[in-house]
A protein has these predicted regions:
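Bacterial N-terminal signal peptides
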Residues: 7-16
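Carbohydrate-active catalytic/glycan-binding domains of CAZyme proteins
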Residues: 18-169
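Positively charged n-region of N-terminal signal peptides that target proteins for export
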Residues: 1-4
Length: 169
């Protein structure tokens, strides 16, 4: 009985220390319109900025990189690529995949570099990995690899990069 009473007193004293009031901040908030379609977005943080990338479907240049300090106000600072040129299927004349864009990008910051992984949405089904030290600067193609549908980069201290995915057959 004494142990039960001691337990209840302990719980009661802990609960008395909890505040029942909520802190609210009054104000008007407005989410400004981004004049773009921003599906499948991916966000990473580096320093005081957040960086976001999204699918561009059929638009070139592709892989818009946007920057924000507050996750509300965004500015486009670069594009990962102007056009895809490593396969003749991406040519505008007689091409078959150029108009289908790049899908489900993933952006990450690791050890002073930014990494972007994305896939075009048609044959030849190969994923691209780009890198840049300055996300507002020039992006360089690091690798073309097996196609991964809606993949995401996962960076570790012991490896440059790693990806997770469901392979497309």
């Amino acid at each position: 009985m004494k142990k039960m009473m001691l337990a209840w007193l302990t719980v009661a004293s802990l609960l008395m220390g909890c505040s029942g009031s909520e802190t609210s901040v009054k104000g008007t908030y407005r989410n400004p319109v981004i004049y773009a379609d921003v599906p499948d977005m991916s966000v990473t943080r580096a320093g005081e900025y957040y960086y976001m990338i999204s699918t561009t479907m059929h638009l070139m240049p592709g892989g818009p990189v946007m920057r924000s300090k507050d996750l509300v106000n965004w500015e486009t600072v670069s594009y990962v690529f102007d056009k895809l040129t490593d396969n003749s299927k991406y040519d505008l004349i007689g091409g078959t995949v150029y108009g289908r864009g790049q899908w489900a990008s993933s952006i990450r910051y690791h050890n002073g570099k930014f990494y972007v992984l994305f896939s075009p949405n048609d044959v030849p089904y190969r994923s691209y990995i780009f890198t840049a030290e300055d996300p507002a600067g020039k992006w360089e193609l690091l690798s073309r690899t097996q196609h991964f549908h809606d993949a995401s980069l996962f960076l570790m201290m012991t490896a440059e990069y790693m990806y997770s995915m469901e392979p497309v057959s």
